[in-house]
Amino acid sequence: MGGYFDGDYRFSANFRQQWWAAGAPFVTSTAGYDTKLMPTKIPEHDIFSVGVMGLYDQSLSGGFKSVDVSANVSYNRSLNEDGQNNFAIGFQAGYASRAINYSDLDFATQFNGSGFDTNLPSYETFGSMRRSYLDINAGLLYAYKTDNTEVYVGASMFHIGNPNISFLKDQRYRLPSRYTVHAGSRFVVGDNGNELFLGGLYMYQAGATEKNFGIAYGLSVSDEATVYAGSWYRIGDAILPYVGLRYNGFQVGFSYDVINTALKNYGTKKNGSFELSMNLLVTRPRNVYTNYKGGRIF
């Protein structure tokens, strides 16, 4: 949910390469920005946030590409005067474009006995195809916060309108809605600002499910810096160790998927995925918001 951060602006970026050792990895990049609006015109502890996000994804050695651009808006309502209990609702609307270029793909007729030869004819005449559509998502979040404890639980629904994503004009294939439920907590441990994080995620789409849970610990090495380490487990699939560093408003994290299913035997045992994430929080000088009383909600 947008707006849940210390500061006034947040810039974020993420890069993920999946199954890189298999020869044709899935590559996903995202970039986002969100900010809080009208802090002096809404009730204390409430947060009104807007943002934008872009996503670029490619697979099949670049033969399939997708681009998503979206805008989001959310509002957090404090349920009591001290801002400990909060309820938020958010919406996201975006434009998505999918393209597949058959000239970048290999077909059975191009196999020469030892590998694929792109100079051999594929006998396919599809060429390049594209499909664009509008997409809508929504989510809810409840958060409880004190000085030393934060707990949240949320749910969201993606692809609410089930847009048609078929590349063929005379056929229709509706993108199934995806449902998620997530929960987590943060606890301050001891007097030096160390932190313990717990979290879990459940996703469902068209009969497929994914269940993750994990734990991380943040070691405060100074007033400006914290070092993080932890691990997630994607049930029945992979272990995801994680390390990270926060310095003032900048945070970077790195995780790697250690595959523990039969997929690890495809070509090489080094078939995991890695992910790099970055966040930058920017705070305006306080004299800009002369009556600003808000703070971090989550």
Where are these regions (language model features)?
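Subset of outer-membrane beta-barrel
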Residues: 1-298
